[in-house]
């Protein structure tokens, strides 16, 4: 199983947990609000366009999307959010990147540091683990939706990098700047992705066993549960995640 497939596995699990906890709307609204700072017109703001597409995929009401955009542009009052990226290590030397959006920087720093230390990890300095990851666009589509040759032609013509078959799915990788064009080309061909977002993909993965693996899972869950956390990335072997999670 490839590295990015392992990433997709945990993201699917994470998405299901988020939905259960009723947190996904909050995270999406924050992303729309932050994105809209660069302009409220999605046609001229790729990040906002991606955020709106993600919200619509989760059936967020249009009114919620509109209000989030207006808070970002300043048309409506609202919390002033700051984006913070944390880097650190989990149990067994697993590299972890946490992306947070908060209206209270000091609180967020304190609580994220505590989450690491309580679960066998430690918060690191900026760029301490970033070099272990690559920022990539990831688009996952069902093999039932398109054959390899057709999809490969779509991907390459739109500027994508790679197409891999993983189980029942095709996984498309792009550079971040090409992501928007590739995902649009896929949708224009009548293919709806199961996953479509810009993410961080680890270059290598770390396997853990037993109590250390369980502790790493607790760290990931604690971070993902935090109200300010938008995304958590790690190079914890995702096959191990499946085994530990059962």
From Swiss-Prot:
Cellular component, GO, one term: cytosol
InterPro entries (alphabetical): Integrase-like_N (IPR017856), TACO1_YebC-like_2nd/3rd_dom (IPR048300), TACO1_YebC_N (IPR049083), Transcrip_reg_TACO1-like (IPR002876), Transcrip_reg_TACO1-like_dom3 (IPR026564), YebC-like (IPR029072)
Entry annotated with the keyword DNA-binding: yes
Source domain of life: Bacteria
Keyword Zinc-finger: no
GO biological process, one term: regulation of DNA-templated transcription
Pfam families to which the protein is assigned, alphabetical: TACO1_YebC_N (PF20772), Transcrip_reg (PF01709)
Protein name in UniProt: Probable transcriptional regulatory protein ACP_0521
Organism of provenance: Acidobacterium capsulatum (strain ATCC 51196 / DSM 11244 / BCRC 80197 / JCM 7670 / NBRC 15755 / NCIMB 13165 / 161)
């Amino acid at each position: 199983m490839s590295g990015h497939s392992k990433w997709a596995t945990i993201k699917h699990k994470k998405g299901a947990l988020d939905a259960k906890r009723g947190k996904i709307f909050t995270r999406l609204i924050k992303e729309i609000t932050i994105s809209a700072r660069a302009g409220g017109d999605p046609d001229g703001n790729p990040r906002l366009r991606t955020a709106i597409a993600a919200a619509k995929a989760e059936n967020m009401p249009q009114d919620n999307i509109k209000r989030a955009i207006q808070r970002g542009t300043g048309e409506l009052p609202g919390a002033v959010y700051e984006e913070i990226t944390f880097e650190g290590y989990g149990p067994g030397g697993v590299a972890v990147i946490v992306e947070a959006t908060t209206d209270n920087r000091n609180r967020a720093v304190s609580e994220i540091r505590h989450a690491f230390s309580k679960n066998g990890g430690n918060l690191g300095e900026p760029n301490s683990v970033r070099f272990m990851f690559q920022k990539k666009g990831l688009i996952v589509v069902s093999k039932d939706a398109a054959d390899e040759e057709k999809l490969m032609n779509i991907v390459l013509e739109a500027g994508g990098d790679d197409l891999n078959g993983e189980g029942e799915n095709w996984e498309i990788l792009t550079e971040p700047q090409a992501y928007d064009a590739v995902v649009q080309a896929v949708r224009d061909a009548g293919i709806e992705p199961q996953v479509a977002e810009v993410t961080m993909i680890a270059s290598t993965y770390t396997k853990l066993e037993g109590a250390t693996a369980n502790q790493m899972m607790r760290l990931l869950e604690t971070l993902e549960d935090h109200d300010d956390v938008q995304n958590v990335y790690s190079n914890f072997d995702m096959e191990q995640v499946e085994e530990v999670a059962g």
